[in-house]
Amino acid sequence: MTISTLDLILGIIMGIVTVRATMRGFVDEFFSKASILCAAVVAILCHKRLVPLTRVLLGHSILLPCITFLITFMGVYCVMLFLRSRMRTYATRDLISGFNQVFGFFFGIIEGSVLLTVILLLLHVQPFVSVSHMLHESVINTVLSPLVLDGVRYMRLKM
C-alpha cells in the first residue's frame, strides 16, 4: 500500500499536534482548549440572563448584550486560567510530571484525530475543487471515513 500526498500532509499535522501536546503536557493543553470552550458556552448560554444586571450597572445602551457577553466570557476565561495555574503547580511536581507528559501525548492523539476528521469533512463538503481522487487513495480517509461520512450526511441535511 502506498502513502498518498494527503496521508503525508495529514500525518505531519497529526505529528505536530501530538508532539506539541506531549511537550506542553496534559494540563496546559487541556486547559488551553477548555478555557475558550467553557467561556464561549457559558457566555452564549448566560449573557441574555445577565443583561438586566448590567443594565442596572451601565445604563441603557444598544451594545449592552455585546458588553454582557464580553464580560461573561472574560470572567469565565479568567476563572479557567486561574484553575490552570493551580493545576500546573501540581502537574510540575516530580512524580506527576511524567504522567502529565504521557496524558498530554494521548490528548494530542485525540486532538489530532479530531482535527484530521474536521479537515477531511471540509474536503468532502467543499464544492470548489474535486478532491475525490485524493480522498479515495488516502489511508487516513479510509480509517476515519465512518466519522467523516456521517458528518457529511449531517451537513448536507442542514444545508
Swiss-Prot record:
Origin organism lineage: Bacteria, Pseudomonadati, Spirochaetota, Spirochaetia, Spirochaetales
Location in or out of the cell: Cell membrane
GO biological process: toxin biosynthetic process
Residues that span the membrane, as ranges: 5-27, 34-51, 61-83, 103-125
Biological source species: Treponema pallidum (strain Nichols)
Membrane topology of this protein: Multi-pass membrane protein
Name this polypeptide is given: Uncharacterized protein TP_0522
GO cellular component, one term: plasma membrane
Swiss-Prot/TrEMBL keywords: Cell membrane, Membrane, Transmembrane, Transmembrane helix
Top-level taxon in the UniProt lineage: Bacteria
Primary residence: membrane
